[in-house]
Amino acid sequence: MGKAAKKKYSGATSSKQVSAEKHLSSVFKFNTDLGQHILKNPLVAQGIVDKAQIRPSDVVLEVGPGTGNLTVRILEQAKNVVAVEMDPRMAAELTKRVRGTPVEKKLEIMLGDFMKTELPYFDICISNTPYQISSPLVFKLINQPRPPRVSILMFQREFALRLLARPGDSLYCRLSANVQMWANVTHIMKVGKNNFRPPPQVESSVVRLEIKNPRPQVDYNEWDGLLRIVFVRKNRTISAGFKSTTVMDILEKNYKTFLAMNNEMVDDTKGSMHDVVKEKIDTVLKETDLGDKRAGKCDQNDFLRLLYAFHQVGIHFS
């Protein structure tokens, strides 16, 4: 990766980039509250773009392009780039940077909040992600009607490690289990804080996220709903998570909805609705032999087995 980058970037190019960044720093102050930490190392920037394996026919979505250090490299390889930028100052600087160049017409800048923006079709996503939207960004990509073929995403190191964590790891959590259901995640590189201007307080990592195709035949909201319950306390038993009054209230409500949709009636001889739902939960946990397991030790197959068993008795999570 380093050798390929050296062929493309001479010392003169790096000096020009540094001068531009110093100019920007004097023009306006970076807003770190918006996650504005500009990637300044050209070798890292080129490495990120290379890992995306962009085809000449690809439309690339870039989230948070900033001053365009990644953007200009993506434009060299992609058919088009759609850059979503929240800060008008950054958008203006990026516009100036490509103005009058051969790639100017290949760039579309969408000004606004990524999480509130309706996205066009795109093949690849590349992002030096504002860390405060890391989790929402991942799930927005996963839930796109036509998800990207691949996403190359820069995250805070600890967040990236949570995406990669396996059952039994200390960082394994609901995020790990949820994302790994829908996508394959691999680690690409570590990026030190000194590669950014201004330097963030934490180290970063770049991950490659490939959404599974075909998509697993599981309802996203049902899967997410189950995980929210079992991971409330990942080191407690799964059965403990179902003893919460709040959880029971939700599941009772969902069960009533299930009965109404199927024109079924509650069997009054079995007690109250609460008793009926509790009995179903206890039965499922016993029959699956998962009641005494800890979510932090369970894998995808365990959770799928649990979800299927609950559905079989009419218990739903969304």
Swiss-Prot record:
Show the coiled coil region(s).
none
Q: Does the keyword Glycoprotein apply?
A: no
Q: Which UniProt keywords apply?
A: Cytoplasm, Methyltransferase, Nucleus, Ribosome biogenesis, RNA-binding, rRNA processing, S-adenosyl-L-methionine, Transferase
Q: Which InterPro entries match?
A: KsgA/Erm, rRNA_Ade_Mease_Trfase_CS, rRNA_Ade_methylase_Trfase_N, rRNA_adenine_dimethylase, SAM-dependent_MTases_sf
Where in or outside the cell it occurs: the entry states: Cytoplasm; Nucleus, Nucleolus
Q: Which GO terms describe its molecular function?
A: 18S rRNA (adenine(1779)-N(6)/adenine(1780)-N(6))-dimethyltransferase activity; RNA binding; rRNA (adenine-N6,N6-)-dimethyltransferase activity
Top class in the EC scheme: transferase
EC number, UniProt record: 2.1.1.183
Give the UniProt entry's GO cellular component terms. Answer: 90S preribosome; cytoplasm; nucleolus; preribosome, small subunit precursor
Q: Which reaction does it catalyse?
A: adenosine(1779)/adenosine(1780) in 18S rRNA + 4 S-adenosyl-L-methionine = N(6)-dimethyladenosine(1779)/N(6)-dimethyladenosine(1780) in 18S rRNA + 4 S-adenosyl-L-homocysteine + 4 H(+)
Q: Which PANTHER family match?
A: DIMETHYLADENOSINE TRANSFERASE, DIMETHYLADENOSINE TRANSFERASE-RELATED
Chain's role: Specifically dimethylates two adjacent adenosines in the loop of a conserved hairpin near the 3'-end of 18S rRNA in the 40S particle.
Into which family does the record put it?
Belongs to the class I-like SAM-binding methyltransferase superfamily. rRNA adenine N(6)-methyltransferase family.
Q: What is this protein called?
A: Dimethyladenosine transferase
Which species expresses this protein natively? Saccharomyces cerevisiae (strain ATCC 204508 / S288c)
Classification of source organism: Eukaryota, Fungi, Dikarya, Ascomycota, Saccharomycotina
